[in-house]
């Protein structure tokens, strides 16, 4: 019977070949692809926020946002881009000795800050486009509320939520690689990414949109007044939206995303599908 998808072993093989290429990209290309990916994820965040901001029921709001947000990763898969969270899977090449730790870390650092640049570009465009004026400024107030919630997260929650998030993101990437046609790839991306949004898990690159755009919105008195009225936020909470306080989110969430992608997905997949278990078993018996 004809097979219309790649097997898990084939997926890991293909992902490792792609990971080796990612680690050895020229610096300029790596930066440009990172900027693109950050911008695409930010566009997913912006449009999903617009769709969900006026919905009072939390579960329904997350469901609606979850339907829209996956477009960001879909664009990256089909158009191109280097996404920090997905590139955590390069760890498979490190374990397989195709890439050095230095090359892996270099890629992750360059891509991380390139993603940030791309997200900040979209943050700025969204703010000055008037998009946050929707519903009498409620979207701007919503941006503030989301950012306040994110900078107030505890380190433990940030790490554990980041782990859960990148398990799903990396699974989405591997599932998309398993599909052999466009429709299959779309659905393969859609459900895991929707799950992480509905679950409310923390994604460091998505937060490069949510936190800065909330900080920008906090400079607008109209949005601030609306946030205080609609969500009961205090002046102190809103004033806490600073670059320094944003690190309360970015540091633990980034650590969690790395652990989720590397320890919970990348390394186990390598050992399941690439390690020569029979040879290892024979060596163990002879030892």
Language model features: what each stretch is:
Residues 1-287:
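Alpha-helical transmembrane segments and their helix-helix packing motifs
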